[in-house]
A protein has these predicted regions:
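Catalytic cores of nucleic-acid endonucleases
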Residues: 121-123, 130-184
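Nuclease-adjacent, charged terminal/linker segments that flank catalytic cores
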Residues: 1-77, 88-89
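Short coil/loop linkers at secondary-structure junctions
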Residues: 66, 158-161, 190
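A structural signal for short, well-ordered beta-strand segments and their strand-loop junctions
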Residues: 125, 167, 192-194
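Active-site metal-binding core of divalent-cation-utilizing nuclease and nuclease-like domains
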Residues: 66-120
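Non-catalytic C-terminal interaction segments of nucleic acid-processing enzymes
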Residues: 24-30, 149, 171-203
């Protein structure tokens, strides 16, 4: 088995991408998953549970957090982060830093939900994909890496890291989604079924 890797450094935005490829003894090239955390973790009692219509605010409140004007509080008067969905990401968060998204992205991307942790200075982009039949959502899953790069350009401007997460329903446990789920992990993104573990978000 042979290991090859390449490193791409973007000097404008100062982030690094590492691509790893493993070839087995039969000469077949196989991707190695860089992500070791996501990838379909089992649901548990210490997670934020989602359904198709569930808002992050409601999921946080179910776990004892207080969400007020997009700020998230837990056991104190000092906010631990922000919950900003859709346009609120820009009007409630980026405007505080006088950041115009057009300086970084040609289009304004509006996530289903986003949790921004002040503790570890990380933005968790959350996209919910729930379906009961094959359809256009399949292709949207494959766009995860592009969307991750777009958000990285935005958040790196203020020194924040970016994590891109899919919350999927059980439909995506079907065998035909194995390759796309592997691809999501390989591209440095994450997915969970129905629930995001609290510790994954630093809560």
């Amino acid at each position: 088995m042979h290991l090859y890797h390449s490193i791409c450094y973007n000097y404008e935005y100062k982030y690094i991408f590492i691509f790893i490829i493993i070839t087995n003894t039969r000469g077949v090239t196989m991707p190695r998953s860089i992500n070791t955390v996501g990838g379909g973790s089992q649901t548990n009692s210490n997670g934020l549970k989602f359904e198709q219509s569930t808002l992050l605010d409601d999921a946080l409140r179910e776990k004892g957090c207080i969400v007020k004007d997009c700020y998230v509080y837990l056991d104190g008067n000092i906010p631990i982060g922000m919950s900003v969905c859709k346009r609120n990401l820009y009007s409630k968060f980026f405007e505080k830093y006088n950041i115009d998204y057009r300086q970084f992205n040609s289009k304004r991307w509006e996530p289903d939900d986003c949790y921004i942790s002040f503790k570890n200075e990380t933005a968790y982009i959350i996209e919910k994909k729930f379906q009961n039949s094959s359809g256009s959502v399949d292709e949207k899953l494959a766009a995860c890496h592009f969307k991750l790069l777009e958000y990285i350009k935005l958040f790196s401007a203020i020194g924040y890291k970016t994590v891109y997460i899919f919350v999927l329903n059980d439909w995506f446990k079907r065998p035909e989604y194995r390759d796309i789920l592997d691809y999501i992990r390989f591209m440095g993104c994450f997915y969970f079924f129905n629930e995001i573990p609290l510790n994954f978000l630093g809560l």
